[in-house]
Amino acid sequence: FSSLTAYILDRKRNRYTSFAKTIITMPMLIPFQTIMISLLKVMTTINFSGSKVGLGIQYWGFGIPMATFIFFNFMETIPREIDESAYIDGADTFKTFSLVIFPLLKSVTFTVIVIDVMWIWNDFLLPLLMVNSSNDTKTLVLAAYSFVGQFNTQWHYAMASMVLAILPSVVIFILLQKYIVEGVVAGA
């Protein structure tokens, strides 16, 4: 979704798309701590508090601005002549994006995926606010935190669960390190 949005914002430049880019990336400037109480009230009102669906919708909403921003900055480096040659060959805008431009975004896509997955996997505050009341929907980091109590801390369980929580992030980073470096360098 973010890559297609960034493609349209970059290729169809006018005052409306410039305004849309500003509106889409503006939430990156607002710290989560300033909206967390009102967000919790809204999610409780619409019965999404305590559910995995509600948590997923929030992660999706918070991740879109950064992903669009990263894709947009990379799109600016792709020459427009590539689009024009695809149009000459008879491709429409969607085919140009899906068959020509999107394969060029492989390294940036992996970078966005790794950044988002690591952010979601390691996040503590949002799941603590939204799904802490139910044992079925707790994340692994919250489950590790449940071993730390006010008067008693079970360090052996807490440390074992933290190792399990850190392990997937390390494995993902090691496997996709090449793409992460390419994506960060390409977007610079």
Regions found by a protein language model. Name each.
Residues 1-188:
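A structural signal for multi-pass alpha-helical bundles of membrane permease subunits
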